[in-house]
Amino acid sequence: MKIIFVFALLAIAACSASAQFDVLGQSYRQYQLQSPVLLQQQVLSPYNEFVRQQYGIAASPFLQSAAFQLRNNQVWQQLALVAQQSHYQDINIVQAIAQQLQLQQFGDLYFDRNLAQAQALLAFNVPSRYGIYPRYYGAPSTITTLGGVL
């Protein structure tokens, strides 16, 4: 009799644990289905509310206009691109450091003008191939190397 009672308790505990896992699984799936923009808006919602309360702009017709909503969406898209562009800037920095190290390491032993030209060409073409550009706005007219000007 005691064994049956113990098995009944174990069965009840297993059923309740299974129900809890189902609820957790459903909430996790809903979390995964939410768009990143919606998640960003949920994170920033308390801050938006604070600004509206602080400055009393909740009833402003501009904030509810279609032009404002469009501009707001554009700002969110631009913010998403900032992280991507900073990644490309890091690539440019690594390329410049690698070139400096190569020149320091091999500059005294020998100088291969063709290699330097190929590296310079690569340094200018790689960023533009991926749609990213270094800090200057146009390509410089000359490139100075150890052997002279390219």
UniProtKB/Swiss-Prot annotation:
Major site of localization recorded for this protein = other
Q: Sorted alphabetically, which keywords does the UniProt record give?
A: Pyrrolidone carboxylic acid, Seed storage protein, Signal, Storage protein, Vacuole
SUPFAM superfamilies for this protein: Bifunctional inhibitor/lipid-transfer protein/seed storage 2S albumin
Q: List every position bearing Pyrrolidone carboxylic acid.
A: Q20
Which GO molecular function annotation, any one, does this entry have?
Answer: nutrient reservoir activity
Is Transferase among this UniProt entry's keywords?
Answer: no
Family designation? Belongs to the prolamin family.
Q: What else is known?
A: Lacks significant tandem repetitive sequences.
Q: What is this protein called?
A: Prolamin PPROL 14E
